[in-house]
Amino acid sequence: MAKLFIPFDRVGLMTCQKSISGTFQVLNALLNQGVELFWQRDGIRFLETPAWPEGHYYQCGFVLEDSISARDILDAGDVFVEQFADLPEPTWRLRPLNIAFYNGRGAEDEFSAPLVKVLQQANFSYNFVSDKDVREGKLKGFDMLLVPGSPDAGECYYAGLGDKGYNQIRSFIADHGHYMGICGGAYLPLSSYHDKNPYWLNIVNATDQEDLDYWRAGSGFVRCRINDDMHPIFSSVALGHSSSMDLVFWEGPAMQIMGENVRSLAHFETLLASGKDPLKPHWDLLDNHMAVDAIKDFYNCLTPELFTKMLHGKCAIAEADYHRHKLLLYSPHPEMGNLGTGPWAESRNFLLIYNGLFYLSAQ
């Protein structure tokens, strides 16, 4: 049977498809219809294609068998697709994820609301779980736990979950599913070496030396240098031997790797802008209201001195293993979108979330 190939090459700050979120919406629609969908992570040079008879190189994409039902979904989503008689064996088979979205006391609405929008516009399904749900062991019915940002470095999670909830999360990651945490959610699995901090899970060999001093840095726009350009979360983001991403930072952890079960995928490199002169952005942030809030409406502005002292060279994005499952930890906020390079809804930064979820689904 013929194969369909959905290219997803990086083209500047966008991709070769018309819409980043729209393409993932179609991919999830295919998965939800039971279509076998594979992620082709390695680049392929074709001698000829229907669109490029002289031959063409594609960086990455998605593979499925040709069918009328699949074509209907692809056509309805206006997704560009190539047809081939045969293709190299793809890297991973993708599966629908049953996501537990934490919305207990530790989930700050200003951080969880944009993450909900990012998931919805790409057709990722999820269910909210409360502190009570977690404490009662209901995480066992899910494939992964997604923890959004919080207003502090972890104590708010403990205020709702307590020891029982923390033990349920540890057991879930060890025995049942994966974990993705953003900002405060990236603090939660860290290990503290201070007796007065019972608010982290202590399940990965990474820490923040400032411990619970959530307000030690501030908010601003940062450039993160990608350490592992071949990691799947950077698919359609990293290209060539050196790549970076520009993201909103809002008091996230400066992670320091302390052991072998965690590795840095990207590190803080440059402070681009903040709400303090002379670093106030001189460009239009368009419809990205969260980026505006991080710069104009937050009292604690990230300064060059604080960036150098607290963040420069520290781990910004990490991957960890805990027993049989994986954790992805994002200190900056990919769900807050771009820094004024285009419409918020088409932010390339969302790929850290979309790719991350697909990566976890394939494990």
Where are these regions (language model features)?
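Well-ordered beta-strand positions enriched in small/hydrophobic/aromatic, beta-favoring residues
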Residues: 14, 99, 145, 201, ...
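A glycine-rich, often tryptophan-bearing local segment used as a flexible ligand/cofactor-contacting loop or short
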Residues: 157-246
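Short, surface-exposed amphipathic charged segments that create phosphate/polyanion-binding patches used
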Residues: 55, 143-145, 216-223, 279-285
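Catalytic beta-strand/loop cores that center a nucleophilic Ser/Cys/Thr
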Residues: 222-326, 331, 335
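A residue-level signal for beta-strand positions that form part of recognition/binding surfaces
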Residues: 3, 61, 98, 200, ...
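Short catalytic/ligand-binding loop motif for oxyanion handling, primarily in non-cytosolic enzymes
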Residues: 154, 188-191, 212, 273-274, ...
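Residues that flank catalytic or metal-binding motifs in active/ligand-binding sites
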Residues: 58-60, 95, 184, 197, ...
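Intrinsic-disorder/low-complexity accessory segments
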Residues: 1-136, 141-169, 173, 178, ...
